[in-house]
């Protein structure tokens, strides 16, 4: 009987300890839940995301803008359809080759350095598009732009993942994905509207101040 009472006391003590621990954990969880909605996205972070997102948006936009310019480019450079398509193909290949390096670049360089490099490449590529008067030069310009876009797009996602409050990551990733999906959708419309009233090089003249 004494042994049975002792066992019951031990069991009751363990239960009380478990209940106290559970209650303590629940209070901590409740406090954490209350704190989460109060997390704010720093203004500096918003500025960084807008800046890098705009750069990525322009890079993706110019990729689809070029498709509606093919007839003009074929006439100006005297090339056929198969050749003029390399303007888009070489850009996409360059972006695809650059993006896998984003993890390495992110470890080696600060976000600011990568952003400035992407801006410099975007401006250089656009200037080359404006002043290039030979088809090979245009292809080189697209390679330069592709490297810039290949750096900017993953950089936007890295900034969101590394610097955003945990409760806001999903929302900001959604905004980042929106940038990537909207840009190619409106590219042909923008390209057609601009090229209908201005020379095709005007697109890149407009892009440079935005960058």
Language-model regions, residue ranges each:
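Short, intrinsically disordered terminal tails adjacent to the first/last structured region
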Residues: 1-33
């Amino acid at each position: 009987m004494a042994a049975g009472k002792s066992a019951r006391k031990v069991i009751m003590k363990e239960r009380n300890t478990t209940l106290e621990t559970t209650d303590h954990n629940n209070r901590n969880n409740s406090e954490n839940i209350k704190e989460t909605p109060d997390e704010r996205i720093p203004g500096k972070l918003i500025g960084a995301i807008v800046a890098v997102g705009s750069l990525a948006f322009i890079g993706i936009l110019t990729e689809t803008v070029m498709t509606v310019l093919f007839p003009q480019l074929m006439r100006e450079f005297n090339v056929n359809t198969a050749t003029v398509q390399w303007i888009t193909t070489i850009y996409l290949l360059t972006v695809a080759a650059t993006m896998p390096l984003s993890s390495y670049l992110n470890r080696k360089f600060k976000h600011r350095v990568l952003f400035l490099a992407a801006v410099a490449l975007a401006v250089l590529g656009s200037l080359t598009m404006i002043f290039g008067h030979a088809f090979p030069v245009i292809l080189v310009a697209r390679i330069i732009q592709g490297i810039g876009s290949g750096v900017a797009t993953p950089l936007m996602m890295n900034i969101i993942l590394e610097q955003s409050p945990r409760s806001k990551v999903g929302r900001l990733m959604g905004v980042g994905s929106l940038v990537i999906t909207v840009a190619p959708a409106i590219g042909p419309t923008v390209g057609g509207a601009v090229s209908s009233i201005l020379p095709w090089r005007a697109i890149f003249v407009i892009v440079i101040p935005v960058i």
